């Protein structure tokens, strides 16, 4: 399993010190189906470990319609060749849109020919002939292992799946009938842990830590990931043959030393 850190341009130098490839979240779709990018400087990595090829992450957030899919695909592939990227990640909003699906199908064909990794959100999986589907690992109910096995079966096995290892930090007010919780920042979670000093438990079903507390007559269930739980999710992914895993650098920068066991 290959590991990647999804980074903004300003984070590349710090993140490049860790034993993971870099997925560069520096690209978006502009007017006229153009490829726009932020200033990007990819530093050479020092040390004994050879770096993995980087990946291009393309966002469609607030982007116009892709009316020239071939031109955009050509621009993306040129950028990959210029920077020696080993693959492409489509960070597209859901639900899927037809213009995005046409573009994904065309780009997927080109990536298959050049043997580049091509990662798609689940709603776009049917747009490409040989997609590698991004599966989010942050679940708050049921069994994590069962969920992952079902996703792998849906997409033809681990070789066709990459993990989006989102760091879970959620506050559920009980009873949580909707299954939806309130996202917590790390600062808010740290403040709760310091204030409440709760007994923290590990959920074998969810592969996550949890604790409970009461406030203003309401019961709260806090579910969160740390470096250990993320490593356990990685371990299961490796056992099941998952192709790669992505961490969002802003989510894990505070635990990166522990996560990667940096010495």
Language-model segments: residues:
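Acidic/aromatic/glycine-rich contiguous surface patches that form carbohydrate-binding/processing clefts
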Residues: 233-263
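Glycan-binding loop/region signatures in secreted carbohydrate-active enzymes
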Residues: 160, 165-233
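Short acidic, glycine/proline-enriched helix-loop-strand junctions
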Residues: 98-101, 107-116, 201-210, 254-263
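Chitinase-like catalytic core of GlcNAc-active glycosidases
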Residues: 1-141
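A generic secondary-structure signal
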Residues: 75-82, 109, 150-154, 232-240
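A structural signal for the main folded, soluble domain(s) of proteins
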Residues: 33-36, 41, 63, 70-74, ...
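A structural signal for short, well-ordered beta-strand segments and their strand-loop junctions
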Residues: 89-91, 117-122, 160-166, 246-248
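Active-site region of glycoside hydrolase catalytic domains
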Residues: 101-102, 116-117, 128-132, 149-175
